[in-house]
Amino acid sequence: MQLEVRNLSVAIHRRPIVSGVSLTVDNGEFVGMLGPNGCGKSTTLRAIYRLNRKYSGLIMWDGKDEHTITQKEFARRVAVASQFNDIAFDFTVREVVLMGRAPHMGMLTRETDSDQEIVAQSLDMVDMAHFSDRSFASLSGGEKQRVILARALAQKPEFLILDEPTNHLDIKHQLQTLAIARDLGISCLAALHDLAMASRFVDRVYLMKAGSVVASGPVGEVVTSERIHEVYDVEARVTPAGPAGDDWDGGLTVAYRYPQRVR
Protein backbone atom coordinates (compact mmCIF):
# COMPACT_ATOMS: atom_id res chain seq x y z
CA MET A 1 0.00 0.00 0.00
CA GLN A 2 1.41 3.37 -1.01
CA LEU A 3 1.25 6.62 0.92
CA GLU A 4 1.89 10.10 -0.41
CA VAL A 5 1.71 13.23 1.75
CA ARG A 6 1.94 16.61 0.04
CA ASN A 7 2.55 19.90 1.80
CA LEU A 8 0.95 18.84 5.09
CA SER A 9 0.52 21.60 7.68
CA VAL A 10 -1.07 21.34 11.11
CA ALA A 11 -1.78 24.08 13.64
CA ILE A 12 -2.97 23.55 17.21
CA HIS A 13 -4.67 26.50 18.91
CA ARG A 14 -3.50 28.58 15.92
CA ARG A 15 0.13 27.69 16.60
CA PRO A 16 1.87 26.00 13.62
CA ILE A 17 3.18 22.57 14.62
CA VAL A 18 3.85 21.03 11.21
CA SER A 19 4.64 23.13 8.13
CA GLY A 20 4.73 21.88 4.55
CA VAL A 21 5.70 18.25 5.20
CA SER A 22 5.84 16.03 2.12
CA LEU A 23 6.76 12.35 2.20
CA THR A 24 6.17 9.05 0.44
CA VAL A 25 6.13 5.39 1.41
CA ASP A 26 6.14 2.86 -1.41
CA ASN A 27 4.74 -0.67 -1.38
CA GLY A 28 6.68 -2.82 1.08
CA GLU A 29 8.98 0.03 2.13
CA PHE A 30 9.99 0.70 5.74
CA VAL A 31 10.41 4.45 6.23
CA GLY A 32 11.54 6.16 9.43
CA MET A 33 10.84 9.65 10.74
CA LEU A 34 13.62 11.06 12.91
CA GLY A 35 13.97 14.26 14.90
CA PRO A 36 14.04 15.66 18.43
CA ASN A 37 11.09 15.85 20.79
CA GLY A 38 8.50 18.36 19.63
CA CYS A 39 9.65 18.45 16.01
CA GLY A 40 6.28 17.31 14.66
CA LYS A 41 6.72 13.57 14.04
CA SER A 42 3.74 12.43 16.09
CA THR A 43 1.57 15.33 14.88
CA THR A 44 2.31 14.33 11.29
CA LEU A 45 1.42 10.71 12.02
CA ARG A 46 -1.83 11.65 13.77
CA ALA A 47 -2.96 13.49 10.64
CA ILE A 48 -2.01 10.50 8.50
CA TYR A 49 -3.89 7.97 10.63
CA ARG A 50 -6.93 10.22 11.05
CA LEU A 51 -6.69 11.08 14.73
CA ASN A 52 -6.49 14.75 13.71
CA ARG A 53 -8.46 15.66 10.58
CA LYS A 54 -7.79 19.40 10.91
CA TYR A 55 -4.92 19.87 8.50
CA SER A 56 -4.11 21.48 5.18
CA GLY A 57 -2.41 19.63 2.38
CA LEU A 58 -3.07 16.30 0.73
CA ILE A 59 -2.86 12.72 2.04
CA MET A 60 -3.26 9.97 -0.57
CA TRP A 61 -3.41 6.19 -0.23
CA ASP A 62 -2.68 4.26 -3.43
CA GLY A 63 -3.28 7.49 -5.31
CA LYS A 64 -6.70 8.16 -3.73
CA ASP A 65 -7.47 11.19 -1.57
CA GLU A 66 -7.90 9.93 1.99
CA HIS A 67 -11.29 11.66 2.22
CA THR A 68 -12.66 9.22 -0.37
CA ILE A 69 -11.76 6.16 1.73
CA THR A 70 -14.34 4.96 4.25
CA GLN A 71 -13.34 4.50 7.86
CA LYS A 72 -14.07 0.77 7.64
CA GLU A 73 -11.81 0.30 4.62
CA PHE A 74 -9.12 2.41 6.28
CA ALA A 75 -9.29 0.32 9.48
CA ARG A 76 -8.99 -2.89 7.50
CA ARG A 77 -5.92 -1.74 5.61
CA VAL A 78 -4.02 0.54 8.02
CA ALA A 79 -2.96 -0.39 11.56
CA VAL A 80 -1.46 1.91 14.19
CA ALA A 81 0.66 1.21 17.25
CA SER A 82 1.07 4.47 19.14
CA GLN A 83 3.03 5.40 22.24
CA PHE A 84 -0.10 6.19 24.28
CA ASN A 85 -1.60 2.93 25.49
CA ASP A 86 -4.21 3.82 28.10
CA ILE A 87 -7.37 1.70 27.79
CA ALA A 88 -10.36 2.79 29.83
CA PHE A 89 -11.69 -0.66 30.78
CA ASP A 90 -9.93 -3.62 32.32
CA PHE A 91 -9.54 -6.06 29.44
CA THR A 92 -7.32 -9.11 29.32
CA VAL A 93 -4.32 -9.08 27.02
CA ARG A 94 -6.09 -11.48 24.64
CA GLU A 95 -9.16 -9.24 24.51
CA VAL A 96 -7.05 -6.18 23.68
CA VAL A 97 -5.35 -7.98 20.80
CA LEU A 98 -8.70 -9.33 19.59
CA MET A 99 -9.78 -5.70 19.09
CA GLY A 100 -7.44 -5.73 16.10
CA ARG A 101 -9.82 -8.14 14.37
CA ALA A 102 -12.82 -5.80 14.76
CA PRO A 103 -12.51 -4.19 11.28
CA HIS A 104 -12.85 -7.66 9.74
CA MET A 105 -15.90 -8.70 11.79
CA GLY A 106 -19.56 -7.79 11.43
CA MET A 107 -21.37 -5.69 14.02
CA LEU A 108 -23.11 -8.65 15.69
CA THR A 109 -20.75 -11.49 14.81
CA ARG A 110 -18.44 -13.21 17.26
CA GLU A 111 -14.82 -13.98 16.61
CA THR A 112 -14.07 -17.14 14.65
CA ASP A 113 -11.47 -19.83 15.28
CA SER A 114 -9.41 -18.09 12.61
CA ASP A 115 -9.58 -14.80 14.54
CA GLN A 116 -8.45 -16.55 17.72
CA GLU A 117 -5.58 -18.18 15.85
CA ILE A 118 -4.46 -14.82 14.46
CA VAL A 119 -4.57 -13.34 17.99
CA ALA A 120 -2.45 -16.21 19.34
CA GLN A 121 0.07 -15.83 16.51
CA SER A 122 0.30 -12.06 17.06
CA LEU A 123 0.94 -12.48 20.79
CA ASP A 124 3.57 -15.10 20.08
CA MET A 125 5.37 -12.77 17.67
CA VAL A 126 5.88 -10.20 20.46
CA ASP A 127 6.69 -12.72 23.22
CA MET A 128 3.45 -12.04 25.10
CA ALA A 129 1.56 -15.33 24.64
CA HIS A 130 2.19 -16.33 28.27
CA PHE A 131 0.43 -13.12 29.40
CA SER A 132 -2.72 -13.66 27.32
CA ASP A 133 -5.03 -14.02 30.35
CA ARG A 134 -3.43 -11.22 32.35
CA SER A 135 -5.13 -7.89 32.91
CA PHE A 136 -3.80 -5.33 30.45
CA ALA A 137 -3.85 -2.70 33.21
CA SER A 138 -1.45 -4.79 35.31
CA LEU A 139 1.31 -4.77 32.71
CA SER A 140 4.44 -2.65 32.67
CA GLY A 141 4.83 0.11 30.10
CA GLY A 142 7.02 -2.06 27.88
CA GLU A 143 4.65 -5.01 28.09
CA LYS A 144 1.71 -2.80 27.14
CA GLN A 145 3.70 -1.51 24.18
CA ARG A 146 4.20 -5.06 22.91
CA VAL A 147 0.50 -5.90 23.33
CA ILE A 148 -0.49 -2.81 21.34
CA LEU A 149 1.89 -3.92 18.58
CA ALA A 150 0.27 -7.38 18.67
CA ARG A 151 -3.15 -5.73 18.29
CA ALA A 152 -1.89 -3.92 15.18
CA LEU A 153 -0.44 -7.16 13.79
CA ALA A 154 -3.77 -8.93 14.38
CA GLN A 155 -5.41 -6.49 11.96
CA LYS A 156 -3.37 -8.06 9.16
CA PRO A 157 -2.86 -4.59 7.66
CA GLU A 158 -1.35 -3.55 4.37
CA PHE A 159 0.24 -0.51 6.03
CA LEU A 160 1.64 -0.22 9.56
CA ILE A 161 2.15 3.09 11.39
CA LEU A 162 4.38 3.07 14.47
CA ASP A 163 4.67 6.09 16.77
CA GLU A 164 7.73 5.69 18.99
CA PRO A 165 7.27 1.89 19.03
CA THR A 166 10.41 1.19 21.05
CA ASN A 167 9.57 3.49 23.98
CA HIS A 168 9.72 1.60 27.30
CA LEU A 169 11.28 -1.47 25.65
CA ASP A 170 14.50 -3.22 26.61
CA ILE A 171 17.14 -3.71 23.93
CA LYS A 172 15.98 -7.20 22.93
CA HIS A 173 12.42 -6.08 22.35
CA GLN A 174 13.48 -2.89 20.58
CA LEU A 175 15.32 -5.07 18.07
CA GLN A 176 12.41 -7.50 17.91
CA THR A 177 9.85 -4.76 17.23
CA LEU A 178 11.80 -3.20 14.37
CA ALA A 179 12.66 -6.61 12.92
CA ILE A 180 8.95 -7.51 12.88
CA ALA A 181 8.12 -4.25 11.10
CA ARG A 182 10.86 -4.87 8.53
CA ASP A 183 10.11 -8.54 7.95
CA LEU A 184 6.32 -8.28 7.55
CA GLY A 185 6.85 -7.27 3.94
CA ILE A 186 4.21 -4.53 4.11
CA SER A 187 4.58 -0.75 4.02
CA CYS A 188 5.58 0.82 7.32
CA LEU A 189 6.07 4.40 8.55
CA ALA A 190 7.63 4.78 11.99
CA ALA A 191 8.58 7.73 14.19
CA LEU A 192 11.84 6.76 15.90
CA HIS A 193 14.34 8.28 18.31
CA ASP A 194 17.34 5.94 18.21
CA LEU A 195 19.37 6.88 15.14
CA ALA A 196 21.65 3.84 15.25
CA MET A 197 18.74 1.45 15.76
CA ALA A 198 16.86 3.04 12.87
CA SER A 199 19.88 2.62 10.61
CA ARG A 200 19.75 -1.16 11.04
CA PHE A 201 16.19 -1.56 9.82
CA VAL A 202 14.66 1.24 7.74
CA ASP A 203 15.02 1.76 4.00
CA ARG A 204 14.84 5.56 4.07
CA VAL A 205 14.37 8.32 6.63
CA TYR A 206 12.88 11.79 6.88
CA LEU A 207 14.68 14.03 9.36
CA MET A 208 12.52 16.72 10.95
CA LYS A 209 13.26 19.90 12.85
CA ALA A 210 10.77 22.50 14.11
CA GLY A 211 7.85 21.06 12.14
CA SER A 212 9.58 20.70 8.78
CA VAL A 213 11.55 18.06 6.91
CA VAL A 214 15.19 19.15 6.65
CA ALA A 215 16.60 16.05 4.94
CA SER A 216 15.45 12.75 3.47
CA GLY A 217 17.00 9.72 1.84
CA PRO A 218 18.99 6.62 2.80
CA VAL A 219 20.03 6.63 6.45
CA GLY A 220 23.73 6.82 5.67
CA GLU A 221 23.22 10.00 3.65
CA VAL A 222 20.91 11.70 6.16
CA VAL A 223 22.37 10.71 9.54
CA THR A 224 25.69 12.54 9.48
CA SER A 225 27.67 14.31 12.19
CA GLU A 226 26.86 17.68 10.66
CA ARG A 227 23.12 17.06 10.45
CA ILE A 228 22.95 15.67 13.98
CA HIS A 229 24.60 18.84 15.25
CA GLU A 230 22.23 21.00 13.19
CA VAL A 231 19.05 19.22 14.29
CA TYR A 232 19.81 17.95 17.81
CA ASP A 233 22.39 20.55 18.92
CA VAL A 234 24.88 17.93 20.08
CA GLU A 235 28.23 16.82 18.73
CA ALA A 236 28.24 13.33 17.23
CA ARG A 237 30.56 10.88 15.54
CA VAL A 238 28.90 8.59 13.00
CA THR A 239 30.71 5.47 11.78
CA PRO A 240 29.68 2.21 10.07
CA ALA A 241 28.80 -0.45 12.65
CA GLY A 242 31.04 -3.05 11.00
CA PRO A 243 33.05 -3.89 7.89
CA ALA A 244 31.07 -4.31 4.71
CA GLY A 245 29.84 -7.86 4.29
CA ASP A 246 29.79 -8.94 7.92
CA ASP A 247 26.69 -9.41 10.10
CA TRP A 248 26.80 -5.77 11.22
CA ASP A 249 26.88 -4.33 7.73
CA GLY A 250 24.22 -1.69 7.03
CA GLY A 251 23.99 -0.13 10.45
CA LEU A 252 25.64 2.90 11.98
CA THR A 253 27.31 3.57 15.29
CA VAL A 254 26.53 7.03 16.68
CA ALA A 255 28.57 8.41 19.58
CA TYR A 256 27.48 11.66 21.22
CA ARG A 257 29.22 14.41 23.15
CA TYR A 258 27.45 17.29 24.82
CA PRO A 259 29.37 20.46 23.89
CA GLN A 260 29.59 21.82 27.43
CA ARG A 261 30.12 20.28 30.83
CA VAL A 262 26.96 20.59 32.92
CA ARG A 263 27.74 22.36 36.19
Residue ranges and their predicted role:
Residues 3-5, 18:
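Conserved structural motif at the start of ABC-family nucleotide-binding domains
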Residues 34-36:
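The feature captures the beta-strand-to-loop junction immediately N-terminal to the Walker
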Residues 49:
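Helix-to-loop junction immediately C-terminal to a conserved catalytic motif
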Residues 57-65, 74:
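Conserved ABC transporter NBD signature motif
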Residues 98, 113-131:
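Conserved ABC ATPase "signature" region
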Residues 160-164:
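Catalytic Walker B motif of ABC-type/P-loop ATPase nucleotide-binding domains
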Residues 225, 231-263:
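ABC ATPase nucleotide-binding domains
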